[in-house]
Amino acid sequence: MKYSLGPVLWYWPKETLEEFYQQAATSSADVIYLGEAVCSKRRATKVGDWLEMAKSLAGSGKQIVLSTLALVQASSELGELKRYVENGEFLIEASDLGVVNMCAERKLPFVAGHALNCYNAVTLKILLKQGMMRWCMPVELSRDWLVNLLNQCDELGIRNQFEVEVLSYGHLPLAYSARCFTARSEDRPKDECETCCIKYPNGRNVLSQENQQVFVLNGIQTMSGYVYNLGNELASMQGLVDVVRLSPQGTDTFAMLDAFRANENGAAPLPLTANSDCNGYWRRLAGLELQA
């Protein structure tokens, strides 16, 4: 299996991102995704900056993929997305059907991101015709669902025409909204948010009345409160999953990437902690569950 670093979903300063990707260039990742995937108002790093970072990574020997917005809300955003799609060098991760259409019109291959509502083989076949070469499974699906879906793909004769990627580490994006919950948590309207999410480099925690961390707010994203960690599920991915994705949580992610690789065959199990780690979705359980 290959290992990928997903796009940074948090709002980090440009300098922090540049330092992160400098380390990513020498990491054990096979694939690096980068780009603004959450909110177009996060302008500390502009489209041109992302493209420059991608070019600086091009000589690392890794596949570089440009990630795009999961929720397109304005015509101005389409102009920026067009710059990504027409970059002329790097593969695109499409997280919105508008970007899928842009790629299809230009006959460009793309990665279908986990934000696309793709739950069956017929949908995958449609995306294949439009140029999909890799599919990142929606985060709430289980191993059992994946097995059944790939069996459907076998019946349609398309199983070997695309790669399967699974988001296997990080806070999971559970929902997207036109509203900004981070701004709302500071009693700000979205139009006057002052990109306050930059104050929360790992999101803003939401606790239940029982003091359980149930969610993390990240701008328009509502994310899982616990960190999804499938580091001990890698053996069960053999023959099903081509690319294991880790969502950056900070520079510690590189050590976690190495730990995943070391445990690919179950030789070095990762220590997981209840009330901070979870693997429920993969096991077909409630998402916040952790099953050994």
Curated annotation (Swiss-Prot):
Source taxonomy: Bacteria, Pseudomonadati, Pseudomonadota, Gammaproteobacteria, Enterobacterales
Annotated metabolic or biological route of this protein: Cofactor biosynthesis; ubiquinone biosynthesis
Alphabetic keyword roster: 4Fe-4S, Iron, Iron-sulfur, Metal-binding, Ubiquinone biosynthesis
Cofactor section: [4Fe-4S] cluster
Presence of the UniProt keyword Cytoplasm in the record: no
GO terms of molecular function: 4 iron, 4 sulfur cluster binding; metal ion binding
GO biological process annotation, one example: ubiquinone biosynthetic process
Subunit record text: Forms a heterodimer with UbiU.
Name of a matching Pfam family: Peptidase_U32
Keyword Cytoplasm: no
Record-stated family: Belongs to the peptidase U32 family. UbiV subfamily.
Impact after mutating residue 193 to A: Alters ubiquinone synthesis in anaerobic conditions. Does not bind iron-sulfur cluster
Disruption phenotype: Deletion mutant is unable to synthesize ubiquinone under strict anaerobic conditions. Mutant shows normal levels of ubiquinone after aerobic growth.
Gene that encodes it: ubiV
Protein function: Required for O(2)-independent ubiquinone (coenzyme Q) biosynthesis. Together with UbiU, is essential for the C6-hydroxylation reaction in the oxygen-independent ubiquinone biosynthesis pathway.
InterPro entries per record: Peptidase_U32, RNA/ubiquinone_mod_enzymes, UbiV
Organism (species): Escherichia coli (strain K12)
Residues holding [4Fe-4S] cluster: 39, 180, 193, 197
Protein name listed in UniProt: Ubiquinone biosynthesis protein UbiV
